[in-house]
Each structure stands twice: as structure tokens, then as C-alpha cells.
Amino acid sequence: MLQPARQKFRKMQKGRNKGIATTGNKVSFGEFGLKAIGRGRLTARQIEAARRVMTRHIKRGGRVWIRVFPDQPISKKPAEVRMGNGKGSTEYYIAQIQPGKMLYEMDGVSEELAREAFRLAAAKLPIETTFITRHIGS
């Protein structure tokens, strides 16, 4: 699963996920893309589950790029522990997703195969997504 190799700080504040994606919102590497139109958080497990179902569906054909990286640690206290006594330990990592963010890209396959692979991947994700095609010449 994806997680940072090292970080400056071990724990992070929750923060807010506002606005729309200004970077990473175009098809840059492949021919087809899966773009977020909803807002939310993707865990490393969800990103990996979607990647697996896509690569299995395209069967050694084509190439898949993951355009998001889970770099925000989420801490959690153990069960039945009283409040206080500091912040819990890091449980997993998430990627904050804003509308317009490109999640995955694919190349080397037909449009029908890519569309079906992205449909299967979107079922594994908790946010609303759409299929995008790169426009030649733009």
C-alpha cells in the first residue's frame, strides 16, 4: 500500500477540504482518465483496491498511472481508552480529494475496455467520479 517513506511531522490536524482542484485536473500521462467530481478522502487501501481491479480487468494490456498519493496521517485511539492522554497513534494514510482531481489514468487499451475498468474501479471508491478522454491537439 502507498504511504510516505518519511515525514516531517508524524501527526497532522484534521483541517478542511475546500475548493476545487487547480493542479492534477487534466489527463497528463495516458489517453483516458478517472476524474473526481465529488469531494472526500481516499485511504491507501481504497486506492490500492481500485488499482487492482483495473489492472486485473485490462489483463496485462496497457498501463495505469495513479495520480493521487495518501500523504496525510490519520490517528486513532485504541478501543475503550479514556479521553485525554494525548493524540492517538497513526492508523492509516489518506489523500484529500477535491472536485476535478484526476485519480487514475490509463493508456494502451481501447476506450470500451478503459471505460469498463474505470467503472469497476469507481465502485471501490467512496466519491463520485467520471470518465475523461484526452483531446488530441489541446
From Swiss-Prot:
GO molecular function: rRNA binding; structural constituent of ribosome; tRNA binding
Keywords: Ribonucleoprotein, Ribosomal protein, RNA-binding, rRNA-binding, tRNA-binding
Annotated spans, Disordered: 1-22
Keyword Disulfide bond in annotation: no
Compositional bias segments (type: Basic residues): 7-17
GO BP field: translation
Segments passing through the bilayer: none
Disulfide bonds: none
One CC-aspect GO term: cytosolic large ribosomal subunit
Superkingdom classification of source: Bacteria
InterPro entries in the cross-refs: Ribosomal_uL16, Ribosomal_uL16_bact-type, Ribosomal_uL16_CS, Ribosomal_uL16_dom, Ribosomal_uL16_sf
Subunit structure: Part of the 50S ribosomal subunit.
HAMAP family from the UniProt entry: Ribosomal_uL16
Entry's family note: Belongs to the universal ribosomal protein uL16 family.
Biological function: Binds 23S rRNA and is also seen to make contacts with the A and possibly P site tRNAs.
Protein name: Large ribosomal subunit protein uL16
Species assigned in the record: Methylobacillus flagellatus (strain ATCC 51484 / DSM 6875 / VKM B-1610 / KT)
Primary gene name: rplP
